[in-house]
Amino acid sequence: MKKKVLAIALVTVFTGTGVAQAADVTAQAVATWSATAKKDTTSKLVVTPLGSLAFQYAEGIKGFNSQKGLFDVAIEGDSTATAFKLTSRLITNTLTQLDTSGSTLNVGVDYNGTAVEKTGDTVMIDTANGVLGGNLSPLANGYNASNRTTAQDGFTFSIISGTTNGTTAVTDYSTLPEGIWSGDVSVQFDATWTS
């Protein structure tokens, strides 16, 4: 009898040991891609963003990452043209927090070291003045061809300023409220064929 009691006590000790273990901890995050589809091969000028932007706050630098945003430019040639100019201008760049705080972030846009501003045009190509567009140079070479010409380049996007409530500016992004900001960054492109 003593042996049975001792055996039952030992079994109870071994089976009860696992109960004191810590519970598993799991975390989950969701990645979201914006999705639309569009085809335009007849307009004189078509600019297509080649991706979307997603800024992440990095605690170690107390700031947001910057991103290269690629785009594709297609133009229809004009055989009577003697010069071609392509410019860009920032239209919208404010992201607003998706809660009641009213917090905003402003996105800066940079093209080859030059800020793209709302107040003026940034020259990307100007064949009359010898600005041939770097990665966009196929457009500078094909603007007077009888077919369509395409080229790809990119802007650098970064968070350049923010507010905690829509009016109070922050200099330290770590003081921003937690959450998600959303909005559009729009750049207008203007092409001019001179005959």
UniProtKB/Swiss-Prot annotation:
Protein name: Common pilus major fimbrillin subunit EcpA
Organism, scientific name: Escherichia coli O6:H1 (strain CFT073 / ATCC 700928 / UPEC)
Intracellular or extracellular location(s): Fimbrium
Induction statement: Negatively regulated by H-NS. Positively regulated by IHF and EcpR.
Domain of life: Bacteria
InterPro entries, A to Z: EcpA, Fimbrillin_EcpA_sf
Chain's role: Part of the ecpRABCDE operon, which encodes the E.coli common pilus (ECP). ECP is found in both commensal and pathogenic strains and plays a dual role in early-stage biofilm development and host cell recognition. Major subunit of the fimbria.
Major location (coarse): other
